[in-house]
């Protein structure tokens, strides 16, 4: 499964999304399937080429099949294709896209002969836990922790603040490593 790529760990992976995609494509092995979080055409082309060269099925998450039904601090309800009223406790539109990637991976596994029930799928989504990602620790006052550490994560955090905390006074405490693009990160949060 190839998740959403961002300009992170560039000292190891490369300085462009295409270079990072090339490095990440190294995990694609013959005899397997690859699942891709859809991105820019140039990034997708890197994975398409790697899969073709290795004779690997490439499954791309179809975000157009994703419909958000409701969201609150209790979680989100969404539809994905023919699956309706799926529940996930993770917050934010980006987490729905991540869930779509998971469901795409499950579809690939089922096509490869794995036995995964609808109940297993729903339970897995409903019971997932990701500490430190827009996690509500306490109510009144609300205390939320988010360990995002790159501009892409901060963009998701900023959107979550707009979606879940609109019109409220917010105090933010941040810490960013010196090697991160903290200027862009703070501009995103402003």
Regions found by a protein language model. Give the residues of each.
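Nucleotide phosphate-binding/pyrophosphate-handling subdomain across enzymes
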Residues: 1, 5-6, 19, 82-190
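Acidic, Mg2+-coordinating active-site environments of NTP-dependent enzymes
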Residues: 2-85, 99, 103-122
